[in-house]
Amino acid sequence: MGSAEDAVKEKLLWNVKKEVKQIMEEAVTRKFVHEDSSHIIALCGAVEACLLHQLRRRAAGFLRSDKMAALFTKVGKTCPVAGEICHKVQELQQQAEGRKPSGVSQEALRRQGSASGKAPALSPQALKHVWVRTALIEKVLDKVVQYLAENCSKYYEKEALLADPVFGPILASLLVGPCALEYTKLKTADHYWTDPSADELVQRHRIRGPPTRQDSPAKRPALGIRKRHSSGSASEDRLAACARECVESLHQNSRTRLLYGKNHVLVQPKEDMEAVPGYLSLHQSAESLTLKWTPNQLMNGTLGDSELEKSVYWDYALVVPFSQVVCIHCHQQKSGGTLVLVSQDGIQRPPLHFPQGGHLLSFLSCLENGLLPRGQLEPPLWTQQGKGKVFPKLRKRSSIRSVDMEEMGTGRATDYVFRIIYPGHRHEHNAGDMIEMQGFGPSLPAWHLEPLCSQGSSCLSCSSSSSPHATPSHCSCIPDRLPLRLLCESMKRQIVSRAFYGWLAHCRHLSTVRTHLSALVHHSVIPPDRPPGASAGLTKDVWSKYQKDKKNYKELELLRQVYYGGIEHEIRKDVWPFLLGHYKFGMSKKEMEQVDAVVAARYQQVLAEWKACEVVVRQREREAHPATRTKFSSGSSIDSHVQRLIHRDSTISNDVFISVDDLEPPEPQDPEDSRPKPEQEAGPGTPGTAVVEQQHSVEFDSPDSGLPSSRNYSVASGIQSSLDEGQSVGFEEEDGGGEEGSSGPGPAAHTLREPQDPSQEKPQAGELEAGEELAAVCAAAYTIELLDTVALNLHRIDKDVQRCDRNYWYFTPPNLERLRDVMCSYVWEHLDVGYVQGMCDLLAPLLVTLDNDQLAYSCFSHLMKRMSQNFPNGGAMDTHFANMRSLIQILDSELFELMHQNGDYTHFYFCYRWFLLDFKRELLYEDVFAVWEVIWAARHISSEHFVLFIALALVEAYREIIRDNNMDFTDIIKFFNERAEHHDAQEILRIARDLVHKVQMLIENK
């Protein structure tokens, strides 16, 4: 029984932890939390469940339905803080009761807010949790909970959560953070969309209909020669905009209020089809009142991705402004009610069939309230005591007023006609007013002016003229027709002038575009269908044929298949070394074995060198900090300088994009001496062995030399000779074990980490003694500057390796050791750059796919030739941002202008992590493989800067969401962080390839 009760308590506490985490994340992202945030409601519900758990009946009140009110009232008698909450809640409840007018829906009232300076009305959810919510906003909820935990015997049973000596204080401690946040009532511009998560925004976008085409309409045409669309494209754009507004209006926002909503309202769009059920809603904005009806198939998302079917149903959707409606016909049947809207031009809208149950009368009641104060129904609905709104009961006045309501005999009327009138306004059908609204001035159009000529006999000369252009000078029609003719001619000149200057600006800009974008893509287009089959990718059969007959397969054809279709997973281990440059296409098996042998020898040599230096680093750490001997991960360092560096580095979170390293290594006097060099020269170089270079040994002069040339391989050769003489048997075993890095933990496990259990203490002590002897022999071989640099880099590597892709099945402790060995080997050869956070993210997929330490080391070295420029010591990131700015400014000018207006995030800093890690953290692991191999193949097929087009494809994939929600810089970072690992990688690649092709065509002007 006790375990079940503990499980309930843990579940309640876990719910509170989850909601606290959500609300703290929102506060960090947006710098504030709105009082109407859904996270506040969820947190209040979770806390209330904890407070009501095993609450005594005496404390809850025997007859009170609101247990929270009873609890706070009782606690308020002895706790001053809770007493203040009681007074505030009573004031809120009195205000809510005092602002309830009859005939106005509560939903509309709640959305209106406070116009009189009083506190805004609370939502039903907020009223439900008003006690906890008020205590939270007043920042005293943690104090109230702490008081309840300390005095639990008065209010709770023994099994209650707050009566638990552990769970009670924990609950109070959890609420300290939310009680320290700032809560606001202001309706900021970004509040209305930031409440929904990224997934909800994407779901709303999918409901609207099929995804917009790539060349979506913008304020100005995109550069390039585009085919003319049919006249139906304009209607498609209007339908898309209507669909977007319809879906957004179904959710509450700052622009409109939802006055009425009813599902399963039937509409028969055509005579030859059945009635379609849908969602009917009535929306009120500051200027207008609009009726909307959306088919249920679109609301439920049951149509899938069929663009044709969605477009058909969007044709059925209704959006009717009531400013265009003059009268409403209502018919009541036993099965329900029917409503027909009649527009100003006499056209009847499709009938709306309401289900039975008074829904038609409810709609008319909300409509009448929405028309106020400017408009009203004629005749108005009647108010009957005890029933509310009812249909009017009118008698026939005369035969002239046949339009008015009348009773059908002595029975109850079933058919009604209501007019919509606006008292105090001029007649709705005044044509001059309509023209003025459209900006054409007060002149009447021709179809309104012609009757003026036909009235009377003053214009007979005009009608008797044989030529339509020959009008007598005394004709009275001239003053009426002349302004219209001048207006049309002026409009024609303006249209032609705008078209000409737009074309001229386009041509002038095109030359500039070619100059800026020509370097981003290859000018020769390699299509996927010549020869066909490239979209299937590089399969196992094609690769086996290439292995058998390499002369008949061209490298470009293989790369084309990889670019358009990817690589079959089974052969990635064999193909990736070719894509990264470890092997060259066309190599024989013997040549590949020679390359592998050279790389393996080089890797083992580097492994031994940095491990020897690591022994010295560890010895110096033990001498400097004996108290922290068993806490290497805390960042123990050699001197105060490195201590400050490590302390600064330890504060960097892995959730940030990159840790910027300000440490500057010593400037070498000779570029050849900036890193350790081998004593022996490598053999004749073979293709693909760029890692191995011929280097000369540098003689070591004195141990006091502070020159960077002391980082040479004559030191390592001295260490190696001491090993050969048997000075450290333990280290020889480590060196030998390093040769089989792919089969188990690397040697670093013995030299870096402290023993995890007492059974390992003795072997570790022996190895430490051997390391001390070795350190005593060769400690003078390294400069203090070098040792400090190595210590700092080892600390950073160890910290990142332990948290690198922890949830992926491959990275068990032995494989993490292998990852560390490869990473340390690379950094040892590039100490001038050092380790920067993010490098492990680039190495991990290579090790997973290749599953070979030496091969991963070589491929990673080739990969870093391109990627190292993205890190702080390189300058490629600024170039990426500038190119992204040019691309989106040219290909999507409307989105670029939006970015420039909303805080000017056209510097594209939100792409930093994308470029730094080649989208590693944005995609699932399997998708990372597919994207990376396309990036590598694209260097030879379409563009050496294909990462730019993938980044642009990510932005374009969510273009409408970004534009519709008017996102600023913070919003777009939050959106893409939430969408990480939820992207459709194949769709992103398809868009990226299309963008490359578009730029190629733009440059060629085809």
From Swiss-Prot:
The Rab-GAP TBC domain possesses GTPase activator activity. Belongs to the RUTBC family. Residues 96-120, 205-232, 657-768 are annotated as: Disordered. InterPro entries: Rab-GAP-TBC_dom, Rab-GAP_TBC_sf, Run_dom, Run_dom_sf, RUN_SGSM2, SGSM1/2, SGSM1/2_RBD. This is Small G protein signaling modulator 2. The keyword Transmembrane does not apply. Keywords: Cytoplasm, GTPase activation, Phosphoprotein. GO terms for molecular function: GTPase activator activity; small GTPase binding. Residues 707-725 have a biased composition (Polar residues).
